Amino acid sequence: MKKIIILLIVGLIFISGCARTVTQRPKGYLGISISFYRQLILSIDGSYYAFIIAFNENNVITEDPNTWQYYIEYDGFNQKFMWGINDFSSYGTLLSGKFSEDGTNFSFKISLNLFSNATSLYMKIFYFVYDPFVYDPLQGFRDLYWQYPDSESIRIDLSTYPYSYNSVLTGNIISGLSLWIE
């Protein structure tokens, strides 16, 4: 009788532990820190930088904005951090990021609640220098020719806690990327 009770207790603990690790999703924030080789100047002499981090819960991200479910933009022209969704119907100042004093590091946090019940998230960084004296006026993101080289989509596992990712990137603008869940 004792063996049966012990077996049932061990089985119950095992099953509840498995269910918890499969279904539990961390609540909190996704932290992102990006390091640059040189000081990032977001506007100079009439030109400005568009710095975009795109997200998708299901698929790999490409340069096509239709593959972005959400994005964060730092618009050097307006000097604002903006949050948007892929159909551009919702676009506004939702978050604030922080630049280091020397302008070589940018960090911010995003609430995981924004990504509904997703267990993974794809992220890709885009970077563009826009000179209004050289290019015609923009008609939206579709007209930008992204200049960030060697960028692959990064898969973030939201079901793993704690999660962290550190990478040294090979592009000529961004030197390092750190991600974490807290």
Describe the residue ranges of each PLM region.
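Surface-exposed extracytoplasmic segments
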Residues: 18-182
